Each structure stands twice: as structure tokens, then as C-alpha cells.
Design a protein with these regions (language model features):
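Active-site microenvironments in enzyme catalytic cores
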Residues: 1-28, 35, 41-202
Length: 202
């Protein structure tokens, strides 16, 4: 399948990968969006122009939301139908390909917009799903000879995660502050942490 939008064939955002997100456009206008190549597409305006009229169950103004939560709650049949419709619209010789006015109003270079958190995450649970990670943590906090808890292989071990730690890609990370005690001082001091660890969540 070819698109009328020119993009690098090595791009992560081809016509076969239609992601959903939320972006801040010009004049602080916020809408749900998708992307192909380096172009971000305003789905709310596409909806207003009737390009999704044949999709059943798609609520009016659904793409004007500040998160994708309501859209996701419509269920897989609806979100899949929208994704297939977007692929159809982005294809060569589609009705959108010939609509210069809509393209001008709905298509923006990635440098012209700012991405937001795509979903509201009120809470989440983190799991020890890697035996290497669980073993390393066990060595730090328990007997290194018995680092892995006996129940680890028999039930999922989870713990409460901090939703505030989930941020948009590219967000600056603020180094935490707390107490540290230099070896040459009698009392601890307050300041930025000396070391910072991080995890990649997938």
C-alpha cells in the first residue's frame, strides 16, 4: 500500500503503523491525532469534515478530548475501524489525497506541534517479570544466596507504581532531592541525589 504523503521508507510511522496520540496544535488547540512520516494529522478536524461518518459507534467530538481514554473505551471494533479508515484516506488516489483544503487544515509537521500524554493513567501496578531483575533486587536487599523469593516462579509478584513517573517522551527528568551523608561530615546534608537509577518499562 502506498501513501500520497511522502515519507522516509525507514520511518517508524508508515502507512502500516497508524498510531493514536494527543497533540497541542497552533493557538494551544488540543486534539487527538495520528502520524505518518513527519506529518501529524488532526483527527478532530477530519471528523468535522465527515471523513469518519460511515463508522458506527464513533461519538461526536470524540477526537476533541484531551486524552484517548474515551476513544479506547469504545472498544476494539471501533478503534480498528478508525485505523483502517485512516489507512484508506492516506492511500494514493484517495478522496483526501485530492482535497488540498483539508490537507492544509489537518496536516502539520511534527516540529509544529507538541505531544501530550495520550491517556490519563490514574494508577498502575508494576510486576517483577524478569528473573534477572528480580534476582538482582533480591541480592541487594536480601541474602544473595537466596535472592529469588520461593513464590516468584509460581505467582506474579507486583507492587504499586507511581503514575506520576509516566511522562511524555522528551520530558526533562528532575533529579530527586534528599539527604546524603558525605564521609567527611558528621551530619547529613540536603540536596540533589548523587546517583540516579532508571528502568525501561515495556
Amino acid at each position: 500500500m502506498k501513501s500520497f504523503v511522502n515519507y522516509d521508507q525507514n520511518s517508524d510511522f508508515s502507512i502500516y503503523n497508524i498510531p493514536f496520540g494527543v497533540a497541542v496544535f497552533a493557538n494551544e488547540y488540543i486534539a487527538c491525532c495520528t502520524r505518518i512520516g513527519d506529518m501529524v494529522i488532526d483527527l478532530a478536524t477530519l471528523y468535522d469534515y465527515g471523513f469518519f461518518d460511515d463508522i458506527e459507534g464513533l461519538n461526536e467530538n470524540i477526537f476533541e478530548a484531551y486524552t484517548l481514554n474515551e476513544f479506547i473505551e469504545l472498544g476494539k471494533p471501533v478503534t480498528k475501524a478508525v485505523r483502517l479508515k485512516i489507512q484508506e484516506l492516506l492511500a494514493e488516489n484517495s478522496k483526501l489525497a485530492l482535497d488540498e483544503k483539508t490537507i492544509e487544515e489537518c496536516f502539520f509537521n511534527i516540529d509544529q506541534i507538541r505531544m501530550m500524554m495520550p491517556v490519563h493513567i490514574p494508577n498502575y501496578t508494576d510486576f517483577y517479570s524478569s528473573i534477572e531483575h528480580a534476582t538482582n533486587v533480591g541480592k541487594m536487599f536480601r541474602d544473595p544466596a537466596n535472592a529469588l523469593l520461593p513464590n516468584w516462579k509460581h505467582l506474579p509478584v507486583g507492587y504499586h507504581g507511581r503514575a506520576s513517573s509516566i511522562v511524555v517522551s522528551g520530558t526533562d527528568i528532575i533529579r530527586p532531592k534528599g539527604q546524603t551523608k558525605p564521609a567527611d561530615l558528621d551530619s547529613p546534608i540536603f540536596g540533589p541525589s548523587k546517583q540516579l537509577d532508571f528502568e525501561l518499562e515495556m
